[in-house]
């Protein structure tokens, strides 16, 4: 039984160069987890597969021109020493932790105990989201005070980027469908919930 899912801070790109449009990323080497490479190949950026702990040295040695990570990485991993720019790309956050509960255990517990567990799990999800959002805001404010440039990728650029990778979510879901997981239905439900909360996706993803 899924109790709750926790979200991370928002992904963005720290760079050694100023940019705020997709063409400016062409040929630039961006350090990232390999699973994120499909997001950058269509814009002709060059993914450099590295763990976050290696991003600083990669940028310091010019192996990479940028780093895909949270804005807090500018402080936590000292990326601000090698990257004077951070772009809020609108990638959103990740679901970094999902809390599960054994169904047999759940069935054995009194209803009032299960209700408390569910309530705390939901409250934890909201609290983690609030903390992550505030951390983003606080770090950005400090970076701006230190002279770091923080750009927000314009909506039309985000829409163009989304168009270039529009088939990625559906194809990924279909791969999981083939393994017996209802991924396409989960993705459709996710989009439905997001729309109900007022979020507008840059396009209608083919599913």
Residue ranges and their predicted role:
Residues 1-207:
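N-terminal secretory/targeting leader peptides
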């Amino acid at each position: 039984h899924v109790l709750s899912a926790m979200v991370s801070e928002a992904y963005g790109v720290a760079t050694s160069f100023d940019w705020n449009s997709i063409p400016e990323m062409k040929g630039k080497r961006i350090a990232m987890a390999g699973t994120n490479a499909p997001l950058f190949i269509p814009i002709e950026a060059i993914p450099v597969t590295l763990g976050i702990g290696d991003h600083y040295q990669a940028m310091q040695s010019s192996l990479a021109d940028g780093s895909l990570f949270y804005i807090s990485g500018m402080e936590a991993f000292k990326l601000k020493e090698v990257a004077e720019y951070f772009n809020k790309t609108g990638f959103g956050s990740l679901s970094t932790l999902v809390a599960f509960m054994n169904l047999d255990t759940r069935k054995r517990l009194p209803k009032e105990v299960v209700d408390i567990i569910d309530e705390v799990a939901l409250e934890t999800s909201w609290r983690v989201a609030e903390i992550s959002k505030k951390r983003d805001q606080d770090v950005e404010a400090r970076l701006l005070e230190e002279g770091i440039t923080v750009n927000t990728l314009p909506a039309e650029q985000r829409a163009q980027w989304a168009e270039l990778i529009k088939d990625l979510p559906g194809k990924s879901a279909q791969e999981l469908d083939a393994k017996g997981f209802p991924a396409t239905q989960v993705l459709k439900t996710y989009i439905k919930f997001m729309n109900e909360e007022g979020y507008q996706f840059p396009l209608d993803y083919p599913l």
